[in-house]
A protein has these predicted regions:
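N-terminal capping/small domains of soluble enzymes
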Residues: 1-111
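Active-site-adjacent beta->alpha loops and helix N-cap segments on the catalytic face
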Residues: 69-79, 125-146, 166, 186-202, ...
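Active-site mouth loops of central-metabolism enzymes
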Residues: 86-104, 154-166, 212-225
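Hydrophobic faces of well-ordered beta-strands that scaffold small-molecule active sites
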Residues: 86-93, 118-120, 154-160, 182-184, ...
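Phosphate-binding glycine-rich loops and their immediate beta-loop-alpha structural context
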Residues: 90, 97-124, 130-132, 143, ...
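Structured alpha-helical segments in the cores of large, soluble enzyme domains
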Residues: 102-113, 135-147, 193-199, 226-235
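N-terminal active-site wall of soluble small-molecule enzyme domains
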Residues: 135, 139, 143-154, 158, ...
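Catalytic alpha/beta core domains of metabolic enzymes, predominantly
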Residues: 169-171, 177, 181-248
Length: 248
C-alpha cells in the first residue's frame, strides 16, 4: 500500500494509487530549500496532478551543505542534564495576554511541578505588552527561584517568531537577555528562515509545526508529515520539533 494518508478515515477502497520515484540534479537547488520545494511541489504537482510528496532522499553531497541540528539528541540530553529518562516539555497558558510578571508566576509553578523545558505558546510572540527579552529576564528569575526549592534548573525556550526582517533582532535581544533556547514556527516562517536563524545562533532551537496540517493532511497533494515536520525541519537546523498528533 502507498502510505499517502495521515488519517484512517481517509482510506478509499476504489482508488488506485502508484508510487513514483523521480530524480533531480541537486545542483539545480544549491542550498535553497524554497527552490527545492518549488521544484517538487510547484505548478501541476500542487494543483492538478493529484500527487503527494512522500519522502525526499538527499545525496550525501547535498546534505553536507546543511548544518542540520547543532545539538542533536545527545546534545539536547546534555543541555538538559538528563540522560536516563524522557525530557518533559510544558508551555505557558493562557496562550496570550500575559505580562512578563504574570507569565513568570505560571512559569515558577510549572517549574515546581517538574517540567524540564518550558516554552511559550506558539500564539505568544512579540506583543507590545510582553517583549521576548522581557519574558526571558522575568522567567529566568522564576527559574532561579524554583531551583532554590527543587535543585533542578528549568530551561526556557522563548518564541521569536515574527516578520522575517525582525527575526535576527529578536535572536540578538533574546541572547543578550540570557535565553536558554529559541522557538520558531517554521510552518509560518518557512524552512529557509529556520535555516538562517540556526546559522546565526549557538542556542538550541525548538521548531514549532503549527500550521503544517495544511501541508500534509490532504490526500491528493502536499507532502507526508514525517517530511514536513521531521526531515526538512531537521535539515534546516531544528534541534527539537513540536509535533502534534492528527487529533490535537
Amino acid at each position: 500500500d502507498v502510505p499517502s494518508l495521515e488519517l484512517a478515515t481517509q482510506i478509499t477502497e476504489d482508488q488506485r494509487e502508484y508510487l513514483i520515484q523521480i530524480a533531480y540534479p541537486s545542483v539545480n537547488f544549491g542550498t535553497d530549500l524554497p527552490l527545492l520545494i518549488t521544484a517538487l511541489l510547484g505548478n501541476d504537482a500542487s494543483t492538478s496532478a493529484q500527487a503527494k510528496l512522500l519522502d525526499i532522499e538527499f545525496s550525501e553531497e547535498f546534505a553536507r551543505k546543511f548544518r542540520g541540528p547543532q545539538y542533536g539528541i545527545k546534545g539536547i540530553q546534555n543541555f538538559a542534564g538528563i540522560n536516563d529518562r524522557p525530557i518533559l516539555l510544558n508551555m505557558i497558558k493562557p496562550c496570550t495576554g500575559l505580562t512578563p510578571k504574570e507569565g513568570a508566576r505560571i512559569f515558577y509553578e510549572t517549574a515546581l511541578g517538574g517540567a524540564d523545558f518550558i516554552k511559550d505558546d506558539e500564539l505568544f510572540g512579540n506583543p507590545v505588552y510582553s517583549k521576548p527579552e522581557e519574558r526571558v529576564r522575568a522567567y529566568r528569575e522564576a527559574a532561579e527561584a524554583a531551583y532554590e526549592k527543587t535543585g533542578e534548573r528549568v530551561k526556557y525556550f522563548v518564541n521569536i517568531t515574527s516578520g522575517a526582517g525582525e527575526i535576527i533582532d529578536n535572536v540578538k535581544r533574546a541572547e543578550e537577555a540570557g535565553a536558554d533556547g529559541l522557538m520558531i514556527n517554521f510552518a509560518a516562517m518557512g524552512y529557509s528562515v529556520l535555516k538562517y536563524v540556526a546559522e546565526h545562533t549557538a542556542l538550541p532551537i525548538l521548531g514549532h509545526s503549527a500550521g503544517t496540517g495544511m501541508c500534509f493532511e490532504g490526500t491528493m497533494n502536499g507532502m507526508a508529515s514525517p517530511l514536513a515536520v521531521g526531515k526538512l525541519a531537521r535539515l534546516a537546523g531544528a534541534d527539537i520539533v513540536m509535533i502534534n498528533t492528527p487529533y490535537g
